[in-house]
Amino acid sequence: MKKILLVIIGTMMLQSCLKDREEKITVAPFEGAIVEPNIGGSAEPNQVWFDLSTNTHTTNERPKWDLAFYSGKEFRVGINYSIMMAAGKIEGATDIDKVTSEMVSDLKEDVQVATFTPDNERYIDNPEGNYISGRTAIGEISATEKDNAIYLVNMGKEIYKGDIEKGSVSTGGDARGWMKVQITREGSAYKLKYAKLDDTTHKEVIIHKNPQYNFTFFSLKDNKEVNIQPEKKNWDLCFTVFTNLIPGAGSYIYSDFVLVNNLGNVGAYVISVPNGQNATEVYNKLSKKDIEENKLSYNDQRTIGGSWRDVFSKSVNAKNIYIIKDSDGLYYKLRFTRLTNIKEERGYPQFEYKTL
């Protein structure tokens, strides 16, 4: 009887050890879908944040936010890349209340997007999205208060409200004006000072970091924090208008752009199907064993960018297939199937994806 008990106990212990050693496998709650993100038409008024594992999204109008305060250990602040915002340091300024329009009249000419001058890239954030060590228009926020400059902020453009020719887009409407800002540290938080250019008093607000999110967003127009991105683990792709760079020509505004959530540990790479091969067949046959892990990019949010479409032919680039790995370690294959709707209007993209 004792021998039987020992065998039973030994078997139970072995099974327990094996269970402890089993690798936990994350199973996607959603296997894939055909998706039509709500960009909103030819003025592309919306940003859409999409989560592949659940086939869910959140949407906001592009001008709903102005500044993005980074939640990591670094103190970094981004500007709204979807509405042609720009920011430049006001040299010699030490008192935000004494800055006037007259003082910055020359700087206004420079702090612009799409001037086709190479050096204007200094007035936008590095489009790769590397907020930790990359360049931002507003410099890293120093622990020494006096080292934090006052910035002239071009507030960019409102959503265009007029008629748009079929097949075209209009990414910007009326100018949103100018502001002056200064940002310092307040313990583990940020202190934001801001005002209209000729105001002689300013507003102040404390912005706290929230580690569940990549950023805390703030609207200078509405004087409040705003909800924009989902929690950093709950989105993979962003569909948006975007301020990018043209080599040798500086900043420029791009429509139909797709960003990857690199800061939330989402990676991606593109497979370009060679001429002579059927892209649909290649897509259908792609499986997890075909993934090349070393090609996944985590340091450039533009891996998809505008490479999925051809604006001149108003069609998708059918040769491009995208491999995406989300923050839970799930893999997806994705391709775009439409740039316009049946009326040939822009701002109605479609894509399909499947879990690998």
PLM features: what roles do these ranges have?
Residues 13-16:
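C-terminal motif of bacterial Sec signal peptides marking the signal peptidase cleavage site
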Residues 18-356:
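Surface-exposed, beta-sheet-biased, low-hydrophobicity segments with strongly acidic/polar composition
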Residues 6-8:
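Sec-dependent N-terminal signal peptides
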Residues 1-4:
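Positively charged n-region of N-terminal signal peptides that target proteins for export
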